[in-house]
Amino acid sequence: MIVLGVDPGSRKTGYGVIAEAEGRLSVLGCGLIRPAASGTLHERIGQLCSGLEEVIANMKPEAVALETAFVGRNVRSALILGQVRGAVLATVIKLGLPVREYAPREIKLAVTGTGAARKEQVASMLPRLLGLEEAPKPLDVTDALGIAYCDLSRGASLTGHCGMTGSGKSRSKGWAAFVDAHPELLA
């Protein structure tokens, strides 16, 4: 299974592609899609969609994973992000790929073992989980890899959820369950 994780933004969009085969994960690629800073929002969204289509054509993912929409205090920013997310979803759906969405807490829980982790904690954990020498930069890229990892973790690519049961309750039992699920991280 090959999953493309996408962390959408109007100025830069992170992406990360992870393949899972026989229980082993490998990063196929990751980076940023950066529309021209001088363009209007509509032009940047168009460039983002073109860049995303190129990533999908090159990496050939079987599914795409996104973080659910986050609504902060800035209404204008939330509206812009909503437009960007809508364009990303439309692009992916147009190309016939399934889309799965995960709450930020689900992603953090899958990567670090705690849903309250900071972005930097997610970034520092991913190299250990994915066999990387160091965490890719910037955080938009590690966020995208974390989203893809969440989708692939614990069979999520087959069940459509990350660490959650149908009732919405976490399957995690805390650090003990995380350590049991990731013995390769023990020194």
Curated annotation (Swiss-Prot):
Record-listed Mg(2+) 2 binding positions: E67
Subcellular location: Cytoplasm
Location, primary (coarse class): cytoplasm
Cellular compartments per GO CC: cytoplasm; Holliday junction resolvase complex
Single annotated GO MF: magnesium ion binding
Keyword flag Metal-binding: yes
EC id: 3.1.21.10
Pfam families referenced in this protein's UniProt entry, alphabetically: RuvC
Gene Ontology biological process terms from the UniProt entry: DNA recombination; DNA repair
UniProt cross-references to HAMAP family, sorted A to Z: RuvC (MF_00034)
Assigned protein family: Belongs to the RuvC family.
Its job: The RuvA-RuvB-RuvC complex processes Holliday junction (HJ) DNA during genetic recombination and DNA repair. Endonuclease that resolves HJ intermediates. Cleaves cruciform DNA by making single-stranded nicks across the HJ at symmetrical positions within the homologous arms, yielding a 5'-phosphate and a 3'-hydroxyl group; requires a central core of homology in the junction. The consensus cleavage sequence is 5'-(A/T)TT(C/G)-3'. Cleavage occurs on the 3'-side of the TT dinucleotide at the point of strand exchange.
Protein name per the record: Crossover junction endodeoxyribonuclease RuvC
Taxonomic source organism: Chlorobaculum parvum (strain DSM 263 / NCIMB 8327) (Chlorobium vibrioforme subsp. thiosulfatophilum)
